Regions:
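Beta-strand->loop->alpha-helix junctions that form or flank phosphate-binding loops
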Residues: 69-70, 257-263, 405, 525-528, ...
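Active-site diphosphate/adenylate-binding microenvironment
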Residues: 29-33, 37-39, 47-60, 365-448, ...
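Hydrophobic "anchor" residues on beta-strands that sit immediately upstream
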Residues: 231, 399, 452-453
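Short acidic loop-to-helix transition motifs that present clustered carboxylates
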Residues: 52, 72-77, 407-409, 527-531
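Phosphate/pyrophosphate-binding active-site segments
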Residues: 2-23, 161, 314-404, 522-560
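Generic enzyme active-site microenvironment
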Residues: 183, 320, 401, 454-455
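N-terminal alpha/beta PP-like core and its mobile active-site loop of ThDP/TPP-dependent enzymes
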Residues: 2-353, 393-396, 476-479, 515
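Thiamine diphosphate
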Residues: 128-138, 328-330, 336-338, 345-346, ...
Length: 560
């Protein structure tokens, strides 16, 4: 309980001065940017529109850095990536109606991947709200309804004095585990109206901790300590909570093999003797996981991709640690612990007993050898060569962002991320066009290291306009486009299912010439020269494009 004596209510001298002498000409938009600054934001993403101009005008009177993209969906992807790599809430400023709706696919990805995006959209003037049809430009009967199924929370403003508290509440919601996108909407007239309210100088929106119940972690520790064949599945929650070190400590304490989900890439060292890497779409890995007598799942809901397309059927006891309450036991019954991964792992480390199993590393080697033999039998040398070239060219600490393309599907299973929180993809919601705008968002967060984006030619066309953004802000992003003349993965799916593919072949531009028309240097490469060309592009300042004409294939599935 909070008591009066715990609070510091007296303003500082600077706060009093700012409150009593606010600058002239401030409006509701100023309250928005002042609140964001007070909460600690430094960078905002977005795209202006008529109803939102009050917010955008206020940006020039603030210290916020604005990164404007060419399409709202891409601005949302950029904010998503900024939130992933920094762990901070990423403000996304949008206009009403079409502008707001264009962001929905990006917000769905942010929700699926637990990325903290603070979307602030405008509305028609307050007089036009209420569900009727007044004929305002961009008008929707219920704009919020379009967002409620996607975001964590919706926050409505109708008066200027509500702006700071509404944004603070949204900020707290976005950053309370599980992280996720939130929606705030403010009418046009509220944003434009002059305000006599004092400058916003003191904001507090501390996210709430999701603490494990001790009786649950006590039982979990006992099960792990006495297990004969414990195994750990590490998901994206481990990465988001910065718990990779604690995960490794626990695995080594009980000699438990660890496999990372595609969202958990980098959570556990790839070459560690206990590392099963990320081969979740391989039946050898699935069989090994099913044989565990105690399976600890940390920060994963064991969804479609993490369960080898729902063919995974554990025979032992499942312990699931998950910050998203709706995911607890949603796919497999077991001991569900609603908690942040870092806090739960800390509790387990304090209570679990040491357990030694010299055979664990041997078992891991056997599984990986079986996986390797299966892949080697499929004549997929080109695909492995291309992926190895990307890994060789990319600095260990550089983030990479992967679109929904065949090379990304390979990377989910076979790419060594080397560091936590460096490999990201759109595998949460699975929409096209994520890679390049997301990489721009990560580069805006840290310009000191190069960022890699990987797309196919089909996905690249979703975000080609953002070459202008990359050039305008001189962001250090290298975009690798694998050009196979169509939607390659869908071509494979349809050919396997129906004998031939339909609607998958594409007439695409000359990506090298197109990039150069934006003032972005571009190179056409080959599998043999990819490593050298990609490393050279990553080493140069500013944006660049590398185009690889290649027809890649997927490894055979094991879930059919």
């Amino acid at each position: 309980m909070t008591h009066d004596h715990d609070l510091v209510l007296r303003p500082t001298v600077a706060q009093t001065e700012a409150a009593l002498n606010p600058p002239k000409g401030r409006n509701g938009g100023d309250l928005v940017v002042e609140t964001l600054q007070g909460l600690g934001a430094t960078t905002v993403f977005g795209l202006p529109g008529q109803h939102a101009l009050g917010m955008f005008d206020a940006l020039r009177r603030s210290a916020l850095t604005y990164v404007g993209l060419r399409v709202e969906n891409n601005a949302g992807f950029a904010a998503d990536a900024y939130g992933r790599v920094t762990g901070e809430a990423a403000p996304l400023l949008l206009s009403t109606g079409p502008g707001a709706l264009m962001s929905l696919a990006a917000l769905q990805e942010a929700a699926a991947a637990s990325a903290p995006v603070l979307a602030i959209g405008s509305q028609v003037p307050a007089a036009g709200l209420g569900g009727g049809r007044h004929g305002y430009l961009h008008e929707l009967r219920d704009q919020q309804a379009s967002f409620r199924d996607i975001v964590k929370s919706v926050h409505t403003v109708r008066k200027a004095s509500q702006i700071p508290s509404a944004i603070a509440a949204a900020w707290q919601s976005a950053l309370t585990a599980p992280h996720g996108p939130v929606w705030v909407e403010i009418p046009q007239d509220v944003l434009l109206a002059e305000t006599a309210l004092p400058v916003v100088t003191a904001m507090d929106a501390t996210p709430e901790d999701v603490v494990p119940r001790p009786e649950l972690t006590d039982v979990a520790a006992h099960l792990l300590s006495t297990a004969e064949r414990p195994v750990i599945i590490a998901g994206g929650g481990v990465v988001r909570s910065d718990a990779s070190g604690k995960l490794r400590a626990l695995a080594e304490k009980i000699d438990a093999p660890v496999v990372t989900t595609f969202g958990g890439k980098g959570a556990f060292p790839w070459e560690h003797p206990l590392s099963l890497q990320s081969w979740l779409e391989d039946r050898h890995t699935t069989n090994f996981l099913e044989s565990a007598d105690v399976l600890l799942v940390v920060g994963s809901g064991l969804g479609e991709l993490s369960s080898n397309y729902y063919t995974f059927a554990p025979r032992g006891c499942v312990i699931q640690i998950e910050a998203d309450l709706g995911k607890l036991e949603s796919n497999h019954a077991g001991l569900g612990i609603h908690a942040d991964a870092r806090l739960a792992l800390s509790a387990l480390l304090e209570t679990v007993e040491d357990r030694r199993d010299p055979s664990a590393a041997d078992a891991v080697r056997e599984v990986l050898a079986a996986v390797r033999a299966r892949i080697d039998s499929q004549e997929l040398t080109l695909e492995q060569q291309v992926l190895a070239s990307v890994r060789e060219a990319l600095p260990d600490d550089s983030p990479s962002f992967w679109d929904m393309t065949i090379l990304a599907y390979w990377a989910w299973s076979a790419f060594d991320a080397r560091r936590p929180n460096t490999m990201h993809s759109a595998q949460g919601a699975g929409g096209l066009g994520y890679g390049f705008p997301a990489a721009l968002g990560a580069a805006a967060a840290d310009r000191t290291r190069p960022v890699l984006a990987v797309s196919g030619d089909g996905g690249a066309m979703y975000s080609i306009a953002e070459l202008a953004t990359a050039r305008q802000y001189d962001l250090p992003v290298t975009w690798l486009i694998v050009d196979d003349g169509g939607y390659g993965i869908l071509r494979e799916y349809m050919t396997d299912a129906f004998g031939e593919a339909t609607a998958t072949e594409l007439a695409c531009p000359d990506f090298v010439a197109l990039a150069e028309s934006f003032g972005v240097p571009a190179t056409r490469t080959s599998p043999e020269t990819l490593s050298e060309d990609l490393a050279k592009a990553l080493a140069q300042p500013g944006p660049s494009v590398v185009v690889l004409p290649a027809l890649l294939r997927m490894f055979a599935p094991t879930h059919l």
